[in-house]
C-alpha cells in the first residue's frame, strides 16, 4: 500500500530542516499525520519505516546537525512515537527538541545491542553476546486461568512482545535494519527456521499493531491488564504471547 502524499511531502522537508524550532514543528506535524494514517488503517510496518527515516533525516538536517548517532528502533526502522528515541553520543539540547513535542528521548546505555543497531562493528564474540542478550529478554509465560489467558495479567507490549523479538532478530541478522527484515535474513543464514521466523514475524506485526493503536488512543503510557483491552486485541495479544 502506497503511503499517503501528506507523509511523503513531510519526509521531503525533513532533510532540509533549517533550525531546531522547525524540527519541533516537523515532529509535531508528523504525529498528527501519523494519527490520520492510523485512522485510515495504513500498514503499521510501513508507517514505522516512514517515521524512523523522518527522525533520522531531522537529526541529520542542517538545522539540527546533531553529532549523535541514532540507535535503537529509529536506527533499525522500527520507531513508533510511543518508543523512546535513543542515540549514542551527547547532545543535551536534542533531548529537549523531542520532549517539547511529547516524545521520549535519551542517550542509550552502552550495550552491544545499541552498538549493533547503530551500525557499529560487532567485534569478536559479538554474536554469542547477542544470543545471551536475547535470552535475557525472554518474557515470562503468560498466566492461564481455566485454559484462557488471565484477564488480570499485566499488558506490556514492548517488554513482552516487541523487545524479545527484536533481540532475537538482532542476533539472527546483526545490522541496522528493520526487525522483519532481520527475521527473513535469519532464515537465509540458517539460524532461524522458516516456521520460527514466520511465527515471530506474525507476533511482531501483531504487537506493532496493538502498540500503535494504543498510542493512537493516547493510552500507551498507562498501565493496563488484559481486561482493559478490547476483545479482539485481547485475543491477538494472547495468541502472540504464546
Model-inferred region functions:
Residues 69, 88-141:
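Conserved catalytic core of two-metal-ion nucleotidyltransferases
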Residues 53-60, 92, 96-99, 170, ...:
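A broad, structural surface signal
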Residues 42, 52-91:
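Active-site nucleotide-donor binding segment shared across nucleotidyl transfer reactions
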Residues 1, 15-23, 43, 111, ...:
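Intrinsic-disorder/low-complexity, polar/charged segments
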Residues 80-82, 103, 203:
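Short coil/turn motifs at beta-sheet boundaries
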Residues 34, 38, 122-242:
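Conserved nucleotidyltransferase catalytic core and NTase-mimicking acidic/glycine-rich helix/loop elements
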Residues 73-74, 105-118, 185-186, 224-228:
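A glycine-rich phosphate-binding loop feature that marks nucleotide/adenosyl-phosphate handling sites
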Residues 1-66:
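N-terminal regions immediately upstream of nucleotidyltransferase
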Amino acid at each position: 500500500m502506497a503511503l499517503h502524499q501528506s507523509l511523503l511531502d513531510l519526509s521531503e522537508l525533513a532533510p532540509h530542516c533549517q533550525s531546531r524550532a522547525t524540527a519541533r514543528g516537523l515532529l509535531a506535524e508528523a504525529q498528527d499525520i501519523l494519527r490520520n494514517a492510523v485512522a485510515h488503517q495504513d500498514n503499521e510496518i510501513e508507517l514505522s519505516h516512514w517515521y524512523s527515516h523522518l527522525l533520522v533525516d531531522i537529526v541529520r538536517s542542517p538545522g539540527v546537525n546533531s553529532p549523535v548517532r541514532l540507535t535503537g528502533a529509529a536506527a533499525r526502522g522500527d520507531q513508533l512515537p510511543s518508543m523512546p528515541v535513543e542515540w549514542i553520543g551527547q547532545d543535551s539540547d536534542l533531548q529537549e527538541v523531542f520532549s517539547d513535542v511529547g516524545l521520549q528521548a535519551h542517550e542509550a546505555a552502552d550495550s552491544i545491542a545499541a552498538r549493533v543497531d547503530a551500525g557499529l562493528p560487532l567485534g569478536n564474540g559479538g554474536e554469542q553476546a547477542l544470543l545471551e542478550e536475547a535470552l535475557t529478554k525472554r518474557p515470562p509465560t503468560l498466566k492461564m486461568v481455566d485454559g484462557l489467558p488471565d484477564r488480570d495479567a499485566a499488558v506490556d507490549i514492548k517488554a513482552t512482545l516487541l523487545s524479545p523479538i527484536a533481540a532475537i532478530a538482532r542476533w539472527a541478522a546483526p545490522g541496522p535494519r528493520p526487525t522483519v527484515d532481520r527475521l527473513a535474513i535469519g532464515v537465509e543464514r540458517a539460524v532461524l527456521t522458516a516456521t520460527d521466523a514466520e511465527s515471530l514475524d506474525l507476533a511482531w506485526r501483531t504487537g506493532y499493531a496493538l502498540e500503535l493503536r494504543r498510542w493512537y488512543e493516547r493510552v500507551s503510557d498507562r498501565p493496563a491488564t488484559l481486561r482493559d483491552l478490547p476483545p479482539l486485541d485481547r485475543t491477538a495479544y494472547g495468541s502472540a504471547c504464546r
